[in-house]
Amino acid sequence: MSPWIKHICLVLVAAFMLVKTTESKKDEALYCSACMAIADEINYSISQTDPKKMIHVGGFRLKPDGSLTDKKVPLARSETYLTELLEEVCKSMSDYALYENPDTKEKSYKRFAPRDNDGGNFPDFKNFKFDGPESSSALKFACESIVEELEDDIISLFASDSDHVAKTLCSEVSDHCKSSVFQHSEL
């Protein structure tokens, strides 16, 4: 083999190894928690939307008889509304903090701030680790990365009103969570 071919092969191997090491640096607990938080926040927002509100969708084309061919879908499951929710979902990541399960010592990010209709139902704070704004900004970055990467998949999952959206999104579509996470989770 000529020396330049060996050099090119060496450069390609080095580049491949560099890509592999940077891919594996994603914090699994962080990205899994961000994915779960996205599903939880969108589910909550959908549940707070009036189910009677409908929106017209379709091309608004005229049929040969002069009538319109549009259809109504629930606002909460419309692509327009879900896109609006996705634009805002990562702002709520400041309501999450690192939580260490006292039994298993597993770490994940969980919501610590009660929602408006929770009636002041605060969680037990002794297992939360509040590391300042750095931890919530890391979760927000992970959230934004997931939303940017999987926006179309997230919208189609929530628009179809499928069961176990969190499991489907976080375990099957994005592969950020192991399926064992869902044996312990209430999502």
Curated annotation (Swiss-Prot):
Motif (Prevents secretion from ER): 184-187
Record function comment: Involved in the maintenance of the midbrain-hindbrain boundary (MHB) organizer. Contributes to a positive-feedback loop of FGF signaling in the MHB, enabling the MHB to exert its role as an organizer for the tectal and cerebellar development.
Saposin B-type domain residues: 28-181
Family, per entry: Belongs to the canopy family.
Pfam families: DUF3456
GO terms for biological process, alphabetical: determination of left/right symmetry; fibroblast growth factor receptor signaling pathway; Kupffer's vesicle development; midbrain-hindbrain boundary development; regulation of fibroblast growth factor receptor signaling pathway
Locations listed in the record: Endoplasmic reticulum
Induction: By the fibroblast growth factor fgf8 in the MHB.
Gene Ontology CC terms, in alphabetical order: endoplasmic reticulum
Keyword hit for Metal-binding: no
Subunit comment: Homodimer. Interacts with fgfr1.
Name by which UniProt lists this protein: Protein canopy-1
Residues spanning the signal sequence: 1-24
Keywords: Developmental protein, Disulfide bond, Endoplasmic reticulum, Signal
InterPro entries: CNPY, DUF3456
Intrachain disulfide bonds: 32-177, 35-170, 90-143
Gene coding for it: cnpy1
